[in-house]
C-alpha cells in the first residue's frame, strides 16, 4: 500500500505500444514484468543495454553497436531507456524492411544528429556492425565487403557520393528500399 510505484503497465502506454508495434497485449505485459525484474527503477542504462545486447551475439563484440542503438532510441537524451523506448527499439530492430525501420536506421547512422549522414559516420557504424560478425563468417565475405572500409566504400558508391558528400534521410530510405544489397550492408543478420 505504501508503494507509490505501480508494477502494472499503464493502460495508456499499453494501448500506444499495441498500436505502434506488432506485439500483443499479453506479450507486452510479459515483457514488462521481465523488464521490471531486470530494471526495478523502470529504466535501463546504456551499460545494462550493452550487456543484454551482448547475450544475443556471444561470439563477437557488439558493445560499440549496442551503444549506437541505445543512442538512437534514447529520444530524450537522459542516458536511459524506459519501457516504451525499449519496446520500440525491439520492434524496429527486429522487423523487416519497413519505412519506420529505415527511419531508425538513418538515425543510427546519423551519429552527430545533424539530419545528414557523412561517409565517416557510415564507416563508424559499419565498423561497429563488423565487430559483431564472428571471425569465421568474416572470412566468407566477398572480397569487396571483407573490411569496414570496403563496406563503407561500397555503400557510398551505391549512393553515387563523393568523399565529402552527405546523404539526407529521404535519399537514404529510398536507396535502401530500392536496393536489397544496401540493406545487407547496413545490418548484420546472424547465421542460424
Curated annotation (Swiss-Prot):
It comes from the Eukaryota. Ca(2+) 2 binds at residues 110, 112, 114, 116, 121. Residues 24-59, 61-96, 97-132, 146-181 form the EF-hand domain. Keywords: Calcium, Lipoprotein, Metal-binding, Myristate, Repeat, Sensory transduction, Vision. Ca(2+) 1 binds at residues 74, 76, 78, 80, 85. A lipid is attached at residue 2 (N-myristoyl glycine). Pfam families: EF-hand_5. GO terms for biological process: regulation of signal transduction; visual perception. Disulfide bonds: none annotated. One of its GO terms (molecular function) is calcium ion binding. Ca(2+) 3 binds at residues 164, 166, 171. Retinal cell specific protein. Probably binds two or three calcium ions. Seems to be implicated in the pathway from retinal rod guanylate cyclase to rhodopsin. May be involved in the blocking of the phosphorylation of rhodopsin. This is Visinin. It comes from Gallus gallus.
Amino acid at each position: 500500500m505504501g508503494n507509490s510505484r505501480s508494477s502494472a503497465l499503464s493502460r495508456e502506454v499499453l494501448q500506444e505500444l499495441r498500436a505502434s508495434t506488432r506485439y500483443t497485449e499479453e506479450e507486452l505485459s510479459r515483457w514488462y514484468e521481465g523488464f521490471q525484474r531486470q530494471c526495478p527503477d523502470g529504466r535501463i542504462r546504456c551499460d545494462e543495454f550493452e550487456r543484454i545486447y551482448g547475450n544475443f551475439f556471444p561470439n563477437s563484440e557488439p558493445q560499440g553497436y549496442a551503444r549506437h542503438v541505445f543512442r538512437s532510441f534514447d529520444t530524450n537524451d537522459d542516458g536511459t531507456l524506459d519501457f516504451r523506448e525499449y519496446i520500440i527499439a525491439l520492434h524496429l530492430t527486429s522487423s523487416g524492411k519497413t519505412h519506420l525501420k529505415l527511419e531508425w536506421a538513418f538515425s543510427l547512422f546519423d551519429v552527430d544528429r545533424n539530419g545528414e549522414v557523412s561517409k565517416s559516420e557510415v564507416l563508424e557504424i559499419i565498423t561497429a556492425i563488423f565487430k559483431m560478425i564472428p571471425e569465421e563468417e568474416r572470412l566468407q565475405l566477398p572480397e569487396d565487403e571483407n573490411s569496414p572500409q570496403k563496406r563503407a566504400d561500397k555503400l557510398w558508391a551505391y549512393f553515387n557520393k563523393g568523399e565529402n558528400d552527405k546523404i539526407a534521410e529521404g535519399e537514404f530510405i529510398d536507396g535502401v528500399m530500392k536496393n536489397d544489397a544496401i540493406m545487407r550492408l547496413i545490418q548484420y543478420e546472424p547465421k542460424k
